[in-house]
Regions:
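Active-site gating/metal-coordination segments in enzymes
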Residues: 53-137, 144, 192-196
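Catalytic pocket-lining loop regions of alpha/beta-barrel enzymes
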Residues: 110-226
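Conserved, mostly hydrophobic/aromatic
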Residues: 7, 36, 59, 90, ...
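Hydrophobic faces of well-ordered beta-strands that scaffold small-molecule active sites
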Residues: 3-8, 44-47, 72-74, 97-101, ...
Length: 275
């Protein structure tokens, strides 16, 4: 079984602007590989963070230096006209799988709702570029986008929640769940089950969150549910993030477990890594 983390951040300078992440000035590919090997993680998808302007270059270097271990979900500036021309060849870059954006704050949140980004959905669909997003307040709007662009693969981050931007725990962090589950009717929408321990006030194996994982599994199925960590804000080890799914969820087993732990993500984002 290949174990592929759907989201990590790597950086080489600056402190994370999101205080839930480790407040260190670097988390390098070398550090990540060491911890991945220790935790039994085969590969990970890098999401270059905005607080380090060199993070995308670091991600490309990681792809080169550790073949098959890393891929990238990158970004183009949404407010620059020249960005539109870059989408067509986006996946031609080594290791680049797609695009990822946060839509929790204005102006990006407003652009999501008022049609400003219609060009993005149309262009990405035509180019076969999947998009991941953090958009807790806009799940209904994402449904409308998914319906209008059925060939565009959309992925919702962090169980649809606010990830590290929120201090809410347990049920209080999951009040959006009905709106997230409603998106399951769109076959082009998937969910990252990333960062789950961060939402828990309990110790490992974070049992209060298991009910929400089961709800996402029942609604979206194992081909549209992706394990991952966002490791630099986890209250536990990488290995425990793995075993929470592989050992503590008795309803997740066999082929479905293999899908959730990596196979489904690679298929959804088109990562043809060699196992």
């Amino acid at each position: 079984m290949q174990i592929v983390d759907a989201q990590i951040h790597l950086w080489g300078s600056g402190l994370p602007s999101n205080l839930s992440h480790r407040q260190v000035t670097a988390f390098t590919p070398e550090e990540a590989i060491s911890l991945m090997d220790e935790g039994g993680v085969d590969a990970a998808v890098i999401h270059p963070p905005g607080w380090d302007p060199g993070s995308t270059d670091m991600a490309f270097a990681a792809v080169r230096n550790y073949p098959g271990r890393f891929a990238i979900m990158g970004a183009v500036p949404l407010d620059r006209p020249e960005s539109r021309e870059r989408i067509a060849g986006w996946r031609d870059q080594p290791g680049m799988l797609g695009l990822r954006y946060g839509f929790l704050a204005d102006p990006a949140r407003q652009w999501l709702r008022d049609g400003t980004l219609d060009w993005l959905w149309t262009t990405a669909q035509k180019a076969g570029v999947p998009i991941a997003m953090l958009a807790t307040d806009s799940l209904r709007e994402i449904g409308r986008i998914a319906e209008r662009h059925p060939g565009l693969r959309l992925t919702i981050d962090h169980l649809g929640g606010r990830g590290g931007t929120s201090t809410l725990k347990d049920a209080a962090a999951m009040t959006h769940m009905p709106e997230l589950l409603a998106l399951a009717k769109f076959p082009n929408v998937a969910v990252k089950a990333t960062g789950v321990p961060h939402y828990s006030s309990e110790a490992y194996p974070f049992p209060a969150l298991h009910i929400y994982l089961r709800q996402v599994y029942d609604a979206f199925g194992p081909r549209r549910m992706f394990w991952g960590t966002d490791i630099t804000k986890m209250p536990c080890s990488w290995g425990q993030c793995v075993t929470m799914f592989t050992e503590e969820l008795p309803w997740l087993m066999d082929l479905d477990l293999e899908l959730v732990m990596g196979d489904a993500l690679c298929a959804w984002w088109g990562w043809g890594r060699t196992v």
